[in-house]
């Protein structure tokens, strides 16, 4: 990510919903706080005690499931892809792969999860990314992700 002085490029929830097909309870990006087409994107997800997953994961010790952290990263990846490429009617970016996922700290109710995805490589409609979710500067999850344009 570049460190030059510039105004952050924000994408609010209303626009996110025009870009992604996901809806409650599976829309897992609240706001994009900055991005650079074809390079990187930073977003946030505020974790509420009212998240439906906490009913069963776990009733007396609520922890955001790792798969939902990965899904939030995948949705961030999709947002970057949609903002980078002109899309023909009906085209989507599909989550196509994951490697080297590591979970380093729990994400709990009340946390603000910061999501960061960066393009590593793009070839023949497949884009590879590195993704990282943090809470208060501490890494919660890191993974290599891929999406496919279809």
From Swiss-Prot:
<comment type="similarity">
    <text>Belongs to the thioester dehydratase family. FabZ subfamily.</text>
</comment>
<dbReference type="InterPro" id="IPR013114">
    <property type="entry name" value="FabA_FabZ"/>
</dbReference>
<protein>
    <recommendedName>
        <fullName>3-hydroxyacyl-[acyl-carrier-protein] dehydratase FabZ</fullName>
        <ecNumber>4.2.1.59</ecNumber>
    </recommendedName>
</protein>
<dbReference type="GO" id="GO:0006633">
    <property type="term" value="P:fatty acid biosynthetic process"/>
</dbReference>
<dbReference type="GO" id="GO:0019171">
    <property type="term" value="F:(3R)-hydroxyacyl-[acyl-carrier-protein] dehydratase activity"/>
</dbReference>
<keyword id="KW-0443">Lipid metabolism</keyword>
<keyword id="KW-0456">Lyase</keyword>
<dbReference type="GO" id="GO:0009245">
    <property type="term" value="P:lipid A biosynthetic process"/>
</dbReference>
<dbReference type="GO" id="GO:0005737">
    <property type="term" value="C:cytoplasm"/>
</dbReference>
<comment type="function">
    <text>Involved in unsaturated fatty acids biosynthesis. Catalyzes the dehydration of short chain beta-hydroxyacyl-ACPs and long chain saturated and unsaturated beta-hydroxyacyl-ACPs.</text>
</comment>
<keyword id="KW-0444">Lipid biosynthesis</keyword>
<dbReference type="Pfam" id="PF07977">
    <property type="entry name" value="FabA"/>
</dbReference>
<dbReference type="GO" id="GO:0016020">
    <property type="term" value="C:membrane"/>
</dbReference>
<feature type="active site">
    <location>
        <position position="57"/>
    </location>
</feature>
<dbReference type="InterPro" id="IPR029069">
    <property type="entry name" value="HotDog_dom_sf"/>
</dbReference>
<keyword id="KW-0963">Cytoplasm</keyword>
<keyword id="KW-0441">Lipid A biosynthesis</keyword>
<dbReference type="InterPro" id="IPR010084">
    <property type="entry name" value="FabZ"/>
</dbReference>
């Amino acid at each position: 990510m570049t460190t030059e002085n510039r105004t952050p490029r924000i994408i609010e929830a209303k626009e996110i919903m025009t870009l992604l097909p996901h809806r409650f309870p599976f829309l897992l990006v609240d706001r994009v706080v900055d991005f650079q087409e074809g390079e990187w994107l930073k977003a946030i997800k505020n974790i509420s005690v009212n998240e439906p997953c906490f009913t069963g994961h776990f009733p007396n010790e609520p922890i955001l499931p790792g798969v939902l952290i990965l899904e939030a990263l995948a949705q961030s990846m999709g947002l970057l892809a949609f903002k980078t490429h002109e899309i023909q009617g009906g085209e989507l970016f599909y989550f196509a792969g994951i490697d080297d996922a590591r979970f380093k700290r729990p994400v709990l109710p009340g946390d603000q999860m910061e999501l960061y995805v960066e393009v590593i490589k793009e070839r023949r409609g497949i884009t590879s990314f590195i993704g990282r979710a943090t809470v208060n500067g501490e890494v919660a999850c890191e993974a290599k992700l891929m999406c496919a344009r279809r």
